A protein has these predicted regions:
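ATPase catalytic-site recognition across NTP-hydrolyzing enzymes
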Residues: 1-37
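Acidic two-metal-ion nuclease catalytic site recognized across multiple nuclease folds
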Residues: 8-9, 178-211
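Short coil/turn segments at secondary-structure boundaries
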Residues: 1-4, 10-16, 99, 146-151, ...
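Mg2+-dependent endonuclease catalytic cores in nucleic-acid-processing enzymes, primarily RNase H-like
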Residues: 3-7, 49-51, 56-162, 208-211
Length: 211
């Protein structure tokens, strides 16, 4: 079991995360990359962060989500842009989600020119309200991560410390991805229209590797 975080935010609890124990990730029907951007290399600056998520049905009626990758750093703009292209090539997401704010605007425009599947995200609530809005997905044991990976534990530690933690860069990418996927119909709290949506919109990603 994990040692308790020095700071526990108690919006998203550690034991709500599900450990993906298989060395290989599941076959995912849909993959999304979620960015929180900041340009600066100063040590006091915010981090840019990215998380990659896959939707999988695991033989169930309802889809689950798995964290497929995560990275953050203090990058200048050219480095950030290079990272975004590299992450796209690594995971081949169906959608790349970038918050529509000053630091995200240049990246949105530049990446669209390269033909990447960019979607702008405009949050309509404050960070704490956004976190509460996705707790049911965690509480219903729908969110998986490979605990043996250091990057996964970094994301998990940051989500469980929120909003008391020192950093929330990963947390922003988590709430952004989960809200967007839920609102887009890829992940729903009840059965709703998931199967109809899946037939229309979700691609077969057989045989693709993620880690």
């Amino acid at each position: 079991s994990q040692a308790p975080s020095a700071e526990e935010g108690n919006i998203i609890k550690l034991d709500w995360w599900q450990n993906w124990e298989n060395p290989d990730p599941p076959e995912c029907e849909y993959v999304i990359q979620s960015w929180d951007t900041a340009f600066s290399t100063r040590t006091t600056a915010d981090y840019s962060a990215v998380t990659t998520w896959g939707v999988f049905t695991k033989g169930l009626d309802m889809p689950n989500l798995i964290l497929l990758g995560a990275e953050k750093g203090r990058w200048d703009y050219p480095t950030l842009r290079e990272k975004a292209v590299k992450k796209f090539k690594q995971h081949e997401p169906d959608s790349i989600l970038i918050e529509k704010k000053a630091s995200g605007q240049s990246l949105i425009q530049d990446l669209r020119l390269t033909g990447l599947p960019i979607f702008e995200y405009q949050p309509d609530k404050d960070k704490v309200a956004r976190a509460y809005s996705i707790t049911s997905l965690f509480h219903n044991r729908r969110i998986f991560a490979p605990f043996r990976k250091d990057w996964a534990m970094e994301v998990i530690d940051e989500t469980r410390a929120f909003p008391a933690g020192m950093h929330d860069d990963y947390m922003d990418t988590v709430t952004q991805a989960l809200i967007w996927m839920r609102n887009g119909g890829y992940v729903v709290n009840g059965a709703d229209t998931w199967l109809d949506k899946r037939e229309q919109e979700i691609y077969n990603r057989e045989g693709r590797s993620y880690y």
